């Protein structure tokens, strides 16, 4: 959270030197990044489906109408997970959550250096709301933004978007 690269060292926990030390002065200079990480951590806590204790089965074993976890591409419910794949959508069905929060969570990844469009699965009476767009100047939305289209999302290059599916807010 404080831009501590550890000079690429993934095992800095065992080093008592500047590689492993955290420079807390960076926190003042990067308050926006720290606020973003705090918001994402709070989002994850609020959506227990993202940290399920049960392994995902990729099937609708509780007959909620959706599998617990599904992958999506340019077409909903269809994706090729192949070598050249540059974008991917993952739908976590909130009905499988062991909490009161039953919101669906869709995480969309665009690894490509150009705009990529991913299909959004139809949610029946629910609508899609954008919560995070990593390519925006302010990536985390304090209030989820209703999507103009519930059919697809056009993602900026090399970005991650997080959407929630919930009943329409009026």
Q: How would you label these PLM feature ranges?
A:
Residues 2-170:
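Carbohydrate-interacting/catalytic domains
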């Amino acid at each position: 959270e404080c831009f501590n690269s550890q000079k690429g060292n993934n095992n800095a926990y065992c080093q008592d030197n500047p590689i492993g030390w955290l420079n807390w002065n960076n926190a003042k200079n990067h308050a926006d990044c720290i606020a973003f990480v705090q918001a994402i951590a709070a989002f994850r806590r609020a959506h227990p489906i993202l940290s399920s204790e049960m392994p995902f089965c990729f099937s609708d074993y509780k007959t909620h109408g959706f599998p617990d976890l599904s992958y999506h591409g340019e077409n909903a419910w269809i994706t090729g997970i192949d070598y050249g794949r540059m974008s991917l959508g993952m739908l976590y069905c909130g009905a499988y959550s062991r909490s009161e929060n039953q919101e669906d969570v869709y995480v969309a990844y665009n690894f490509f250096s150009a705009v990529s469009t991913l299909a959004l699965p139809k949610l029946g009476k629910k609508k899609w709301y954008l919560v995070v767009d990593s390519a925006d100047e302010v990536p985390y939305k304090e209030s989820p933004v209703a999507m103009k289209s519930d059919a697809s999302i056009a993602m900026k290059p090399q970005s991650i978007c997080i959407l929630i599916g919930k009943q329409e807010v009026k």
